[in-house]
Amino acid sequence: MSKMTRHDAQLYELKKKIEELKKIRGRGTELISLYIPAGYDLSKVMQQLREEYSTAQNIKSKTTRKNVLGALERAMQHLKLYKQTPENGLALFVGNVSEIEGNTDIRLWAIIPPEPLNVRLYRCDQTFVTEPLEEMLRVKDAYGLITVEKNEATIGLLRGKRIELLDELTSNVPGKTRAGGQSARRYERIREQETHEFMKRIGEHANRAFLPLLEKGELKGIIIGGPGPTKEEFVEGEYLHHELKKKILGVVDISYHGEYGLRELVEKASDILRDHEVIREKKLVNEFLKHVVKDTGLATYGEREVRRALEIGAVDVLLISEGYNKVRVRVKCNHCGWEELKTMSEEEYEVYRKKITKCPKCGSQNLTIEKWDVAEELIKMAEEAGSDVEIISLDTEEGQQFYRAFGGLGAILRFKI
């Protein structure tokens, strides 16, 4: 798997874990979040946890005290598994997740993030602290987008696979006149002045939008488009800040303005952005659709079909929508050995878990229920098979189509099966 797509897969897995953690609520302040930065001394963390354990023995509520002490014990046990802090640091989330009052179900999530952690934090609260990890999901690299014509302008950003509309401007530049002589020349001067003022206003708005990103090192380039020569006049004039002018990657002919114009600008600038993820995603989804429509046998979709293709090493690129939320559930009776394996949504799982209270074969209530994320399982299978993985966003038309028409799971194949 290429470095880029592996990182995408790691971020996708992180996003799913964050979503799971954010749903959990403690009955008291009993959920522990622990962030250990890369390179930090684990013995110091253990010392802090022992001090917290001593303090927690003074908690007045018997239930909360029991749950906090249990969570701290579990965290300390887990840290003993590490000789040193993992390369990118470590985030631990521990606490009682039982929904039944009085019951204890201490669970632990250990996350080695895809990027170095630079935060050291210990927090005991009713919710887990996920903001430092969420910051890793925020796409930093951005491209400035400007569409310009005589009477209208749009300013936007391409950030990851999302096109954001930041600003829309209109002008009072009058149209051309048929009058002759001095009236025409005076009218033309007024028109030129109005155009100049409008261009200045576009530049000011663009400077406000893009300079902060440039200062943070997030602005990778600017693309400018429009239907006529106005865009070239804007580029050649002294309207944009000189540091932003250095970031102009290209000027493109487009027909539309507004939000649709921004989308057209990105589409028409595909050569400039050929390595950008939104262009790569569009090409991959269109390639997948082409194989499906032409029935070439080099595309498949649906969990069972994709799983089989991965098992025999037939997958070239695994496509997973960020909206895909299926889980795999295995229920086993520890008395008679009956077993059931099903795939369902998270919502269906909540209903299923409450309904299956005893074995349908022998009636025993001694059941073991396992649940795991289908997407994470398939990504690991793809890695083992040497397949690429592409996470398809819901921010493009192609991504929406892939999710709605194919359930958000498909594959481009190396060979027919």
Curated annotation (Swiss-Prot):
A cellular component term, taken from the record's GO annotations: cytoplasm
For this UniProt entry, which residues form the secretion signal?
none
Q: What is its main location?
A: cytoplasm
Give the record's family classification. Answer: Belongs to the eukaryotic release factor 1 family.
GO MF annotation list = translation release factor activity, codon specific
Q: Which Gene3D superfamilies match?
A: 3.30.1330.30, eRF1 domain 1, eRF1 domain 2
Q: Which UniProt keywords apply?
A: Cytoplasm, Protein biosynthesis
Q: Entry's NCBIfam families?
A: aRF1_eRF1
Name the job this protein performs: Directs the termination of nascent peptide synthesis (translation) in response to the termination codons UAA, UAG and UGA.
Subunit structure, per the record? Heterodimer of two subunits, one of which binds GTP.
Localization, per the record, is:
Cytoplasm
Q: Which gene encodes it?
A: prf1
What is this protein's name? Peptide chain release factor subunit 1
Species: Pyrococcus horikoshii (strain ATCC 700860 / DSM 12428 / JCM 9974 / NBRC 100139 / OT-3)
